[in-house]
Swiss-Prot record:
Top-rank taxon, per record: Bacteria
Family: Belongs to the UPF0210 family.
Disulfide feature: none
Subunit structure: Homodimer.
Protein name: UPF0210 protein lmo0534
Lineage: Bacteria, Bacillati, Bacillota, Bacilli, Bacillales
Positions in coiled-coil regions: none
Pfam families hit by this protein: DUF711
InterPro entries assigned to the protein according to its UniProt record, in alphabetical order: UPF0210
């Protein structure tokens, strides 16, 4: 590399908050299935602790060697509904506790995969797991849960959508002492991906290798600084600038993934190209959009600005990396983005605009606080809307919403750390009860028939 490129990378890290957001080790638990739940849990604990024993140490060694901040070291596992489903257990909270204990033992901050895939229907394991999610999240610290309720090929399982509204509500109540923190670790998906390194939606797909390393990069501050240098230029120039910047960011992710793979003796999977914000000043996706010329995110033009950003990040990132995957786009989590928080407080950004933006961006309605008296049916209807956007547009969408008990519009919900602070946003006051009560399945769209 030329000296100026090395200096540029150092500046990106020191001044523009460029970092590797996560190194996530995906671990298959398919060989841990057992008719005896206790035996299965012992196998699960042993496998996770054995495979991930050096994950945190290797991450820290790479940080020291290259001077690249690696914010999180995490683990994803095969959806537990599949693994626990072979046991005779009638409650899976003990499986969640096993995951939690393993995560603490190896020192990772989150473990994902307390999950069920029910886009077309339930198995016994799915039913038990989904029913146990509120207690599992209330009784663990590091476990993340996700449920896939729809896909472009199968349509939307509206029975699962209805149930997830109830699950979110119950989770908020059981974790009311932490302002509904359990809901921040629960994601409802359509078109969930099998190699996502980001929490809370990560799980290790059944089509994946026994063990793999996936990397999630992040650099909103770097992209914003690059756009500052092309003020007033046409969008062609803006797109090209973002592309070139995304290339540099992703190159770093590729390097870290390869080195981690070699040091751990585990195959390198993918780099997720997502721009993931944090609550820190200078690390905001909203501020990138505003740098393109919007007075505040949420105003007219926001969706178009996000479309340009998302597409340019993918085009630049794909050139820099052998295998891309995960969610790959821009995240717009309200509580984790200083610009989003401000826009909500100023009344510039509402749920309806966020929903429009999710037709473009990486995920969906993410880290949004709504009033504590929001009904389970309203939450389910929000999930149905997001799932419909994902299913019709053949993309991943998701809902991570927090109906924090006792809160009303305008209150602030404090999570701390990377999860940030969420202003409580108003929801539509009209009822969706009869709509959600129908149940059944919304059929797959006509363009899903590809064969």
């Amino acid at each position: 590399m030329e000296t100026n490129q090395i200096l540029e990378t150092i500046r990106m890290i020191e001044e523009e908050k460029l970092d590797i957001r996560t190194i996530t080790m995906g671990i298959s638990l398919l060989d841990c299935m057992d008719g005896d739940g206790e035996a299965a849990r012992k196998k699960i604990y042993q496998k996770i602790v054995t495979k991930a024993r050096n994950l945190v140490a290797v991450g820290e060694a790479i940080e020291s060697e290259f001077g690249i901040p690696i914010i999180n070291k995490r683990i994803s596992v095969t959806p537990i509904a599949i693994i626990a489903g072979s046991s005779a257990d009638t409650d899976y909270v003990e499986f969640a506790k096993t995951l939690d204990a393993a995560a603490k033992e190896v020192g990772v901050n989150f473990i994902g995969g307390y999950s069920a895939l029910v886009q077309k229907g339930y198995t016994k394991g799915d039913e038990i797991l989904i029913r146990s999610i509120p207690q599992a999240l209330a009784q663990t610290e590091r476990v993340c849960s996700s449920v896939n309720v729809g896909s472009t090929r199968t349509g939307i399982n509206m029975d699962a959508v209805r149930q997830m509204g109830e699950v979110i509500k119950e989770t908020a109540d059981l974790t009311a002492d932490t302002q509904g923190l359990g809901c921040a670790k629960l994601v409802v998906f359509a078109n969930a991906v099998e190699d996502n390194p980001f929490m809370a939606g990560a799980f290790h797909g059944v089509g994946e290798a026994d063990c793999v390393i996936n990397v999630g990069v992040s650099g909103p501050g770097v992209v914003k600084r690059a756009i500052e240098k092309v003020k007033g230029e046409p969008f062609d120039i803006v797109a090209e600038t973002v592309k070139q910047t995304a290339f540099k960011i992703t190159r770093m992710g590729q390097l870290v993934g390869q080195v981690a793979s070699e040091k751990l003796g585990v195959p390198f999977g993918i780099v997720d190209l997502s721009l993931a914000p944090t609550p820190a000043i200078g690390d905001s996706v909203a501020h990138i959009l505003e740098e393109m010329g919007l007075e505040m995110v949420g105003t007219h033009g926001t969706t178009a600005a996000l479309a340009l950003l998302n597409d340019a990040v993918k085009k630049g990132g794909v050139m820099a990396c052998g295998h891309v995957g995960g969610l790959s786009g821009a995240f717009i989590p309200v509580s984790e983005d200083a610009g989003m928080i401000e826009a909500v407080q100023q009344g510039a950004l509402n749920l309806e605009k966020l929903e429009a933006m999710t037709a473009i961006c990486s995920v969906g309605l993410d880290m949004i606080a709504v009033p504590g008296d929001t009904t389970a049916e309203t939450l389910a209807a929000m999930i149905a809307d997001e799932a419909a956007i994902g299913v019709i547009n053949n993309k991943t969408t998701a809902v991570r919403v927090i109906p924090a008990s006792g809160t009303k519009v305008g209150d602030m919900v404090e999570f701390g750390g990377l999860l940030g602070t969420a202003p409580v946003m108003p929801v539509n006051g009209k009822s969706s009860v009869d709509f959600i009560a129908r149940g059944g399945r919304i059929p797959a769209p006509i363009h899903s028939f590809k064969n």
